[in-house]
Amino acid sequence: MKKRLFFTIAAMFTVTLSALAQYDDEYEIIVTDANGQRQEIDIPEAMTFEVDSMLNQYYSKTFLADDENCTTSSSDPEFTDQEYIDRLSRLPYVVPMPYNEIVRKFIDRYTKSGRRTVGYMIAAMNLYTPIFEQALETFGVPLELKYLPVVESGLNPSAVSHAGAAGLWQFMITSGKRYGLRVNSLVDDRRDPIKSSYAAAELLSDLYRIFGDWHLALAAYNCGPDNVNRAIHRAGGSKDYWTIYPYLPRETRGYVPAFIAANYVMNYYCEHKICPMRSTLPEKADTVMVDRDVSFKTISDYCGIPVEQLRALNPQYRRDVVNGSSEPSA
């Protein structure tokens, strides 16, 4: 297959989510367990990114704007636990969406301090959805897992974690290569929204085949199958996520609750008076096949497309060069 250059594709936002929160409580949530003990749960890294960093990037400033016909309220309406339970139970999902204090804390993170971030991510999610759903459907993975990149990367294809995971789905180099993603000096397919989505769907399918439970598969996606197996062993062989929960790595304990919260907020943002941002990105993609090296500068000069826009739409190319000649294929 010849190399592909995506000139315009609505789904490909590139924002650098680099600014982190200022205080310790921005990195963790505190709950009380069944024994009355204080429990500190790490917040996924993408949930600590500042919305101002997102909105100051080239693509956000060029193609996103607040909707003049809808204003996000400054405060979040209050709801009872039963209302949250009822809403989660109405979602037409295969993956269980239980409600508890931990899930509620993560919902509050999105609907209270993260209101502007949610408005941004809804706009981005509307555009990424076709890519995610097609990849998940190909491997028989429940479509609700399309919201996993909300937790993983904040929907930033160029996001890089402190551990070196990259892209929308936050692949490490080793796992990315195992699932066919090229990582070299010129190309990082972990940042390619399409290729990484298919790789993630295949990985999730494999993890479900191992554990037979979507919560455990999600935990393994975050911390690896070995850590989940160790937690199962320490929990006496139980394969219930909430039973093995205390034995999982600290950073993984908040992962499934954050995923449930992301599914909730992406479906019920209106009830919380959160307005999506308005996107002026084109709805169609134009693909050009190349079989030789072409620089972004050459493409920009020929097509009149700013280099910054080419970078934003093609985050997988690391040196502003589409390397069509390095790995020619049919």
What are these regions (language model features)?
Residues 1-26:
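Bacterial Sec-dependent N-terminal signal peptides
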Residues 20-139:
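An acidic, Gly/Ser/Thr/Pro-rich helix-cap/linker signature
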Residues 102-105, 120, 124-127, 131, ...:
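Extracytoplasmic/secreted proteins, especially bacterial periplasmic and envelope-associated proteins
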Residues 106-120, 154-162, 170-212, 232-246, ...:
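Substrate-binding clefts and substrate-entry loops adjacent to catalytic sites
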Residues 141-159, 217-224, 310-314:
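Short, functionally critical alpha-helical segments immediately adjacent to catalytic or ligand/cofactor-binding
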Residues 248, 313-330:
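Extracellular LysM carbohydrate-binding repeats and other cell-envelope/extracellular binding modules
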Residues 250-271, 327-329:
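Catalytic cores of secreted or luminal carbohydrate-active enzymes
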Residues 277-304:
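Primarily a LysM-type cell-wall glycan-binding module
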